[in-house]
Amino acid sequence: MAKLTKRMRVIREKVDATKQYDINEAIALLKELATAKFVESVDVAVNLGIDARKSDQNVRGATVLPHGTGRSVRVAVFTQGANAEAAKAAGAELVGMEDLADQIKKGEMNFDVVIASPDAMRVVGQLGQVLGPRGLMPNPKVGTVTPNVAEAVKNAKAGQIRYRNDKNGIIHTTIGKVDFDADKLKENLEALLVALKKAKPTQAKGVYIKKVSISTTMGAGVAVDQAGLSASVN
């Protein structure tokens, strides 16, 4: 068995794995234990009461966090004409059609989000093997295939997160940075949970949001007591 580092020993001593913490206490604990030499992200894992083997119970979507994620996001947009000008005005770093596709085929992938207008999907479709494995393929379910590319660019820049359950029915995403004010992290978490509730599949039975845990990039998960969250979540 690998020897625990001093940092991991401290984390294990501080975090009770059997306890559900009040959200304010959980955030304070994360901040106390975030001792990495960079500003760690605050990540969340939400266990959903779904059968992930059934396609009609899978949960996928996007929402804009009220306080963003703390990340600067580079956006590439496939579109043309007036939409291209609107995308540039909204802040997109890369805008084009076949020319942009050619850049990507050459391995130039200097972006975090790809957005496309419906008429551009004939071009984007050629890039499935490149964009798909990286989770960058535009999809109408998360608002990245849309006639209103300017709004999609603004959402991406404003801190939109995309979520999708894994094979175990768990959503993994980020809700900000550990140096955010505690209230902002709490409000971001609540916004995510509200979005997940709205995305609940009609076929899902029983308790839907079963467990919520937050962690930092280099830290342990801290289970959150949902009773301490706003009424809109519960």
Curated annotation (Swiss-Prot):
<keyword id="KW-0687">Ribonucleoprotein</keyword>
<protein>
    <recommendedName>
        <fullName>Large ribosomal subunit protein uL1</fullName>
    </recommendedName>
</protein>
<dbReference type="InterPro" id="IPR002143">
    <property type="entry name" value="Ribosomal_uL1"/>
</dbReference>
<comment type="function">
    <text>Binds directly to 23S rRNA. The L1 stalk is quite mobile in the ribosome, and is involved in E site tRNA release.</text>
</comment>
<comment type="function">
    <text>Protein L1 is also a translational repressor protein, it controls the translation of the L11 operon by binding to its mRNA.</text>
</comment>
<dbReference type="InterPro" id="IPR023673">
    <property type="entry name" value="Ribosomal_uL1_CS"/>
</dbReference>
<dbReference type="InterPro" id="IPR028364">
    <property type="entry name" value="Ribosomal_uL1/biogenesis"/>
</dbReference>
<dbReference type="InterPro" id="IPR016095">
    <property type="entry name" value="Ribosomal_uL1_3-a/b-sand"/>
</dbReference>
<comment type="subunit">
    <text>Part of the 50S ribosomal subunit.</text>
</comment>
<dbReference type="GO" id="GO:0006412">
    <property type="term" value="P:translation"/>
</dbReference>
<keyword id="KW-0689">Ribosomal protein</keyword>
<dbReference type="GO" id="GO:0000049">
    <property type="term" value="F:tRNA binding"/>
</dbReference>
<dbReference type="GO" id="GO:0006417">
    <property type="term" value="P:regulation of translation"/>
</dbReference>
<dbReference type="GO" id="GO:0003735">
    <property type="term" value="F:structural constituent of ribosome"/>
</dbReference>
<comment type="similarity">
    <text>Belongs to the universal ribosomal protein uL1 family.</text>
</comment>
<keyword id="KW-0678">Repressor</keyword>
<keyword id="KW-0699">rRNA-binding</keyword>
<dbReference type="GO" id="GO:0022625">
    <property type="term" value="C:cytosolic large ribosomal subunit"/>
</dbReference>
<dbReference type="GO" id="GO:0019843">
    <property type="term" value="F:rRNA binding"/>
</dbReference>
<dbReference type="Pfam" id="PF00687">
    <property type="entry name" value="Ribosomal_L1"/>
</dbReference>
<keyword id="KW-0820">tRNA-binding</keyword>
<dbReference type="InterPro" id="IPR023674">
    <property type="entry name" value="Ribosomal_uL1-like"/>
</dbReference>
<dbReference type="InterPro" id="IPR005878">
    <property type="entry name" value="Ribosom_uL1_bac-type"/>
</dbReference>
<keyword id="KW-0810">Translation regulation</keyword>
<keyword id="KW-0694">RNA-binding</keyword>
